[in-house]
Each structure stands twice: as C-alpha cells, then as structure tokens.
C-alpha cells in the first residue's frame, strides 16, 4: 500500500512540475522577444523611424532596401513573397508536402505556379487577385 502511495505521489509531482513549467513558459514570458528584450509598439516605431537608412525601411523587417518591392518576408525560410499586379507584395506560407522542394530557391520560388487551387502559392494569389478562385 505504501508503495502505491509513493508511486502516486511521484506521478503527481512530475505532472504538477510539467504543468507549472508549461504555464511559466507560455504565460509569464508574454511580451518578451528572443534575447529577453521587451519592446513596446512605440519602441519598435521609434527604432524603425530612427534607422539610418537613405532609401526605404521595410516595416515588417526594419531592413534598408532600394524600394518596397525589395523588402524580404519576415520569415523567408517558411514564406513566399508574392507580387500583386499593382506592384505590392504579400508574404504567404510556403506550400508543404511533396511539392515543397519547388519553393526552396528564394530567387525563383515566387514564379512557381502549381496550377492547382488546393495549393496556395503565388500562382494561386495571382488567380485570387483576378477573382478566378
């Protein structure tokens, strides 16, 4: 009987440790960025506005580029930059699965069109823009 109670207490303590670790990681650290720096929207805005850039500062990444069309996506390893007919662009998640290797080259991945409305790539964005989806 004592052995059963001991095992029960061990399992309860392990479960509660995991729960508190989960709560601490997901709720106590809210609002913190990687590296432990907390940045409010006002601080972010000031950092972007005070960037030493003579060209164009991308609002999503803070990078200095020649023109808005050269702004990279915030997460280039998992996003495609799709150009719209009006010259703007938007970033979408790269398609997954068997077709995903086609989208690995950032210089050409925006040109790939699977021609399948079930695969959301830049071709799909273009068709959606024209009202064909």
Swiss-Prot record:
Signal peptide (from-to): 1-17
InterPro entries on file: LCL2
A single GO BP: ERAD pathway
Keywords, comma-separated and alphabetical: Signal
Residue intervals passing through the bilayer: none
Disulphide-bonded residues: none
Keyword Signal listed: yes
Family membership: Belongs to the LCL2 family.
Function: Probable component of the endoplasmic reticulum-associated degradation (ERAD) pathway.
UniProt name for this protein: Long chronological lifespan protein 2
């Amino acid at each position: 009987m004592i052995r059963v109670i001991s095992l029960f207490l061990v399992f309860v303590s392990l479960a509660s440790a995991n729960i508190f670790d989960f709560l601490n990681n997901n709720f106590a650290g809210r609002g913190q960025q990687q590296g432990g720096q907390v940045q409010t929207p006002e601080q972010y805005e000031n950092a972007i506005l005070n960037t030493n850039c003579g060209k164009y500062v991308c609002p999503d990444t803070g990078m200095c580029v020649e023109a808005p069309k050269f702004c990279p996506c915030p997460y280039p390893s998992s996003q495609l930059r799709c150009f719209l007919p009006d010259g703007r662009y938007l970033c979408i998640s790269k398609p997954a699965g068997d077709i995903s290797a086609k989208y690995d080259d950032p210089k050409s991945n925006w040109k790939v069109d699977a021609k399948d409305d079930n695969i959301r790539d830049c071709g799909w964005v273009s068709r959606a823009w024209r009202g064909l989806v």
